[in-house]
């Protein structure tokens, strides 16, 4: 008998029919002898519908009141799922984040979980009940309802698994696991049986949408075994593990991640003096713009060109700030480019194998793809390229690192 926390997202509970299917799946696990805690999101599209309603009142809704409003979406889903389970003869009870005391800070719309009081859930489990908990929400010390931001239900699931010391946290999605890359781009992408937390964290931060980065961070911090599974198909999914040895038989590179949400900014001809990076990035940070990759080139005339990347939706704001900085510092110009993308190779095998980066660069060179920026870590190499070459680059790297599935075994 195992204690399993199962999390189902909005698509998985998007209709009453799908909620009935989820109830069947939960019943199957319980009939097998497992204790089950279920975390669910609001039905697909419901959170957006509620936000749109709020914006009909105010373009910038008060965050506290917005949290009160959008948290109702999950309340509907938990009650429906509990009803579906009870109809099947499975004792079940539903709880909001407040009712199980998921304590968060007071950062409305983007709160972070501080503590969970697991006693109430443990009593229900002991009494033989399936506990259905609303994801995405909690309560602060003053009793105010809070929400965790987009993807917060994943974090709720992992946090509950940690608090309950569950044997596994299962994240159910519309894919049957973590793939070597997006199967929509590379038909020969393969599902990974196992991947390390480090690799998953890198892939999540680099644009992989399978798991939210906060959930992966939480799982790694509290050593919660994570498994990604398809909501309505049978299969082993992908186990995310702390043990690198379990991944030793995998290739050097576990996956190719990519992100189109990139923009590049450059300030040219800046006087090369101490503190130049802070003078540029300080105001950018103050404008709440997150900087990703950075490259600095020093010229012979004691000036420097400073280039960095940001999220594409921050581009206009960042360029406006950078133009002001250029005028203040006497730089030649501030320019930008939104026609870029980032491609990354990820794998713990890089630690013990030389020449991985050069192999990546060679594969791109063979396709005449120019590299504009490079960033590396122990288990990752990222490059910025022209966006129109993105899919070509991903396919070339997938083949170069021998990640293609054998003939007749491609992703569907």
UniProtKB/Swiss-Prot annotation:
One of its GO terms (cellular component) is cytosol. The keyword Glycoprotein does not apply. Coiled coil: none annotated. It catalyses: L-aspartate + ATP = 4-phospho-L-aspartate + ADP. It is found in: Cytoplasm. Belongs to the aspartokinase family. This is Aspartate kinase Ask_LysC. It comes from Stutzerimonas stutzeri (strain A1501) (Pseudomonas stutzeri). The lineage of its organism: Bacteria, Pseudomonadati, Pseudomonadota, Gammaproteobacteria, Pseudomonadales. The gene is lysC.
């Amino acid at each position: 008998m195992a204690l399993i926390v199962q999390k189902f997202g909005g698509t998985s509970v998007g209709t009453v029919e799908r909620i009935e299917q989820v109830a069947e799946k939960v019943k199957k696990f319980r009939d097998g002898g497992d204790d089950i805690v279920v975390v669910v999101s609001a039905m697909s599209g419901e959170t957006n519908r509620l936000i749109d309603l709020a914006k009909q009142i105010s373009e910038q809704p008060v965050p506290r009141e917005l949290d009160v409003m959008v948290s109702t979406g999950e309340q509907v889903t938990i009650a429906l799922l509990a009803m579906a389970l009870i109809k099947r003869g499975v004792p079940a009870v539903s709880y909001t984040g407040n009712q199980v005391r998921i304590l968060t800070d007071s950062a409305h719309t983007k709160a972070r979980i501080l503590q969970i009081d697991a006693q109430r859930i443990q009593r229900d489990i002991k009494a033989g009940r399936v506990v259905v908990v609303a994801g995405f929400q909690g309560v602060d010390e003053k009793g105010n309802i809070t929400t965790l931001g987009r993807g917060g239900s994943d974090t709720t699931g992992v946090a509950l698994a940690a608090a309950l010391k569950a044997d596994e946290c299962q994240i159910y999605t519309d894919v049957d696991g973590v793939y070597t890359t997006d199967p929509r781009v590379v038909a020969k992408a393969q599902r990974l049986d196992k991947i390390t937390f480090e690799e998953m964290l890198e892939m999540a931060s680099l644009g992989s949408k399978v798991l939210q980065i906060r959930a992966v961070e939480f799982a790694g911090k509290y050593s919660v075994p994570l498994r990604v599974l398809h909501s309505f198909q049978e299969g082993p999914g992908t186990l995310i593990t702390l043990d690198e040895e379990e991944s030793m038989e995998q290739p050097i590179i576990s996956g190719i991640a990519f992100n189109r949400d990139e923009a590049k900014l450059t300030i040219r001809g800046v006087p090369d003096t101490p503190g130049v990076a802070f003078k540029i990035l300080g105001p950018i940070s103050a404008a709440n713009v997150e900087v990703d990759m950075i490259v600095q080139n020093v010229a012979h005339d004691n000036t420097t060109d400073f280039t960095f990347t940001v999220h594409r939706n921050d581009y206009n704001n960042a360029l406006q700030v950078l133009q002001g900085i250029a005028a203040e510092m006497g730089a030649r110009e501030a320019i930008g480019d939104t026609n870029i993308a980032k491609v990354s190779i990820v794998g713990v095998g890089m630690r013990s194998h030389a020449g991985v980066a050069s192999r990546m660069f060679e594969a791109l060179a063979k396709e005449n793809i120019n590299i504009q920026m490079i960033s590396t870590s122990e288990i990752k190499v990222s490059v910025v390229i022209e966006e129109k070459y993105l899919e070509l680059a991903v396919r070339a790297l997938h083949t170069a690192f021998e990640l293609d599935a054998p003939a007749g075994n491609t992703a569907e």
